[in-house]
Amino acid sequence: AYTWNPNTNLVAVCDLNKEITDRIAEQYNVKTYNDVNEMLDNEEIDAVSIATPDAFHMDPALAAIRHGKPILVEKPLATTSEDAKKILAEAEKYNVRVAVDYHKRWDPAAINVRNELQNEESGTPIRGYMCMDDIIDVPTEWFNWADKSSPVHFLGTHCYDQIRWYMGCEV
């Protein structure tokens, strides 16, 4: 997606798997690395996007933060409170911005719901509830990291974020 945005310049990509980085280098004509610290040491990077599997966000996040780079982490920030607290503590220590990509906030239907709830005539919401009614087959056999995450992490987290956003409060 970054290659489609005229306001971004994809500088480098890092993945532990050399086969993946070789394919990306050829497909996107971009420098690739298999070590995040090497990439951060050698490239002029304004910000880092972290799109590792859910349970593996912490190490690249901490590396980028320690290099003073703001990060955008695919949701969820972490799969444990301990990892999330470590990331946020380091971000505070290094005065680095951390953002989590809760992209449902940009869906037109979600924006309409929030706007309606912000309307004075709607009153003040006192309770939030969301349900994902669709039967979604999560292809856990495709993910070699599936045992380290769950649908709550990669799907349910949207519900928590939307309730918080809709109601203007922390959950």
Say what each PLM segment does.
Residues A1, N9, I20, D35, ...:
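Hydrophobic alpha-helical segments typical of transmembrane helices
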